[in-house]
């Protein structure tokens, strides 16, 4: 499929990257689909970077209620991130979260999610002082030396008591 030696090597590398990303010990011949997937990945990473640089434009949080099974009361919520891009439309979390992790953008993104979720929880505590907000952290965030000070600063800024925050590891860990 290549016209030049350089293209041949480039396409072989794309196929190798694809094979590694989709399971070990695989042999994958290059196809135009691999190039299309790689192009989409690069475009999404660039758009994620732009969204973050422009104040997390297109990102929003939705909240999954956590309900007490005994009495049906909402006792907390889990913060879930969503992203809509003008050029790409609604991008599923299963697609954009791994790209944030691979690119290192998960660190500023995760800090934004944490702060926004804590702001929301602090407001919702007016209805129920025992309300608990759960936030998922990526393994990349756990490696950050600034994580604990960042959480402490956000707790202080939002007035959310530490007992009202649950920090969880993402499933990708």
Where are these regions (language model features)?
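Catalytic core of bacterial c-di-GMP phosphodiesterases, primarily the EAL and HD-GYP domains
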Residues: 1, 27, 37, 69, ...
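Active-site core of bacterial EAL-family cyclic-dinucleotide phosphodiesterase domains
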Residues: 29, 40-99, 136, 168
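Flexible, glycine-biased helix-capping/connector loops in cytosolic signal-transduction modules
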Residues: 22-25, 57, 163
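Hydrophobic, Leu/Ile/Phe/Ala-enriched alpha-helical segments that form helix-helix packing faces
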Residues: 15-16, 52, 121
């Amino acid at each position: 499929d290549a016209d030049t030696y350089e293209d041949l090597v480039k396409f072989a590398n794309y196929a190798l990257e694809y094979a590694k990303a989709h399971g070990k010990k695989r042999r994958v011949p290059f196809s135009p689909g691999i190039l299309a997937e790689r192009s989409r990945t690069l475009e999404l990473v660039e758009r994620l970077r732009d969204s973050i640089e422009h104040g997390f434009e297109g990102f929003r949080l939705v909240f999954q209620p956590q309900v007490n099974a005994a009495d049906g009361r909402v006792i907390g919520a889990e913060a879930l991130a969503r992203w809509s891009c003008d050029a790409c439309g609604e991008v599923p979390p299963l697609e954009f979260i791994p790209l944030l992790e691979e690119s290192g953008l998960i660190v500023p993104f995760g800090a934004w999610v944490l702060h926004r979720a804590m702001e929301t929880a602090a407001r919702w505590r007016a209805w129920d002082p025992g309300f608990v907000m759960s936030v998922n952290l990526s393994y990349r965030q756990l490696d950050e030396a600034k994580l604990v000070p960042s959480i402490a600063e956000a707790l202080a800024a939002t007035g959310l008591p530490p007992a009202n925050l649950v920090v969880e590891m993402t499933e990708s860990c």
